[in-house]
Curated annotation (Swiss-Prot):
InterPro entries: Glyco_trans_1, GS/SS, Starch_synth_cat_dom. The keyword Transferase applies. GO terms for biological process: glycogen biosynthetic process. Gene3D superfamilies: Glycogen Phosphorylase B (3.40.50.2000). The keyword Transferase applies. This is Glycogen synthase. It is an enzyme of class 2 (transferase). One of its GO terms (molecular function) is alpha-1,4-glucan glucosyltransferase (ADP-glucose donor) activity. Synthesizes alpha-1,4-glucan chains using ADP-glucose.
Length: 485
């Protein structure tokens, strides 16, 4: 099949959140299944120097009263085709925000539709989040192009209808209240980025005022879990890690831990319980919960906490104050550093994700891959990926709590601290976490099933049966799993 992915991000060149990882990593797995997969994104300023871009555009046109051109490039790692929509509105390196954000992405959606109609016509146009939300509305007129819309985060829903009417000249009934609603109404299939999140968003608590619409379209809604690139994220080969390691030589992690402690200004002591967090510092990620429990945890245990990220000023200030009050035990770097984030994954003992809501989450998958035990709230994709620790039966991959309450989070932290003191069982827990299967292989197979379904291809793919071989959270190496349980 010919499949075109349209999005605002594509890792590793342009990445802010999990959407960039999906758009960057899903195509290679689909290509291995025999499909012609390409990606179209806005031509942000820095991309023209990062990528080998064609000298001449492959397509020129006009939409929404402005000229644009589409250029062809290749993904720097996986070598599949990427199309860049060129227009001065994208010349800045700023991806989100700004006064013209609504116009920019509506223009990008319109340009993508023109390109798909008149240049490279896909069988499936796979749209991601509100930035591409108007594409299914326009493509609904074309029976030859089927649309799939992926919800990465329902909280961000795009411009409201009065703006859309002025920008697109579409009457209000063509897009409901905003572009997210428009996409869900008109897309042929809709998916969320985890099965649990697909169920949650149909409830009042997580539906962001769209639960009625989501229940109405539930027949075409499903959840497909994100994956990670196991080659890119491999602690045995990661060039950033000072000490490479695998389940066969976990003792090497201690060297990474000491270096992490030193770089973040913590007391260098491998026996201390080191908690890591790499996150946007926003309410969604439960940073306020961490602020509420940290003082008690540091007072009653010998734990250390290392935080990396940027976000809301009041949360940054709270974390900074903790670092001042607990030198050598609490450290925060208010930036994003890929090398340091990998060191946190590969050197911390446990990883914090006390999220209010979590559509899928990539960090817990990376933490497990690198032997850092996730401590998570049972919500969204965290339910689908982290199994509660059961030391009596040698089962589980992390520590979980249900309510978004300080006492629940604190209890999980203390339980994990106590478990850390039992080195043999902790090592088994690390090995179970590190051997979980969360590659893109299963995700690609599930997307393929959805693509064929939406295109009306009745005969099952010969690869569909393979889906059943990969249950979420099973060991990547069954023989190894038996040896460590």
């Amino acid at each position: 099949m010919r499949i075109l992915l349209a999005a605002a991000e594509c890792a590793p060149m342009i990445k802010v959140g999990g959407m960039g990882d999906v758009v960057g990593s899903l195509p290679p797995s689909l290509i291995k299944l025999g499909h012609d997969v390409r990606v179209i994104i806005p031509g942000y300023g820095k991309l023209w120097s990062l990528l080998d871009v064609s000298n001449e555009p492959v397509f020129r046109s006009n939409t929404m009263g402005a000229d644009f051109a589409v250029y062809e490039a290749k993904h720097p790692i996986h070598n599949y085709v990427i199309y860049l929509v060129g227009h001065p509105t994208f010349d800045s390196d700023q991806i989100y925000g700004g006064e013209n954000e609504d116009w920019r992405f509506t223009f990008f959606a319109s340009a993508t539709a023109e390109f798909a109609w008149n240049c490279w016509k896909p069988q499936v146009l796979h749209c991601h989040d509100w930035h591409t939300g108007m594409i299914p509305v326009w493509m609904h007129q074309d029976p030859e192009i089927s649309t799939v819309f992926t919800i990465h985060n329902l909280k961000y829903q795009g411009p409201w209808r009065w703006k859309l009417e002025k920008m697109t000249w579409c009457p209000w009934y063509m897009h409901g209240d905003h572009t997210m609603a428009a996409a869900m109404l008109y897309a042929d299939r809709v998916n969320a980025v985890s099965p649990t999140y697909a169920d949650e968003i149909k409830t009042h608590e997580y539906g962001e005022s769209l639960e009625g619409l989501l229940n109405y379209i539930s027949g075409k809604l499903r959840g497909i879990l994100n994956g990670i690139d196991l080659d890119e994220w491999n602690p045995a080969k990661d060039p950033v890690l000072p000490a490479k390691f695998s389940i066969k030589n976990l003792e090497n992690r201690l060297e990474n831990k000491k270096i992490l402690q030193r770089e973040m200004g913590l007391e260098v002591n491998s026996k201390k319980y080191l908690l890591g967090m790499v996150s946007r510092l926003v309410d969604q990620k439960g940073v306020d919960l961490l602020l509420q429990v940290s003082r008690r945890l540091l007072a009653y245990t010998d734990s250390q906490i290392a935080v990396l990220g940027t976000g809301d000023r009041y949360l940054e200030s709270g974390l900074w104050q903790l670092a001042l009050d607990y030198p050598g035990r609490f450290s925060v770097f208010l930036t994003y550093d890929d090398s340091l984030s990998r060191l946190i994954y590969g050197g911390s003992d446990a990883f914090l994700m006390p999220s209010r809501f979590e559509p899928c989450g990539i960090s817990q998958l990376l933490a497990m891959r690198y032997g850092s035990i996730p401590i998570v709230r049972r919500v969204g994709g965290l339910v689908d990926t982290v199994l509660p620790h059961d030391p009596e039966n040698n089962h589980g991959t992390g520590f979980c709590f249900d309510r978004f309450e300080p006492i629940d989070f604190y209890t999980s932290l203390v339980r994990s601290w106590e478990a850390f003191r039992h080195k043999d069982s902790w090592e088994l827990l690390q090995k179970r976490a590190m051997t979980q299967e969360f590659s893109w292989q299963r995700s690609a197979l599930e997307y393929e099933v959805m693509y064929k379904d939406v295109c009306g291809i009745k005969e099952p793919s010969p690869d569909v049966a393979e889906v059943e071989k990969f249950s979420y959270g099973q060991s990547a190496d069954p023989s190894l799993k038996k040896s460590i349980t």
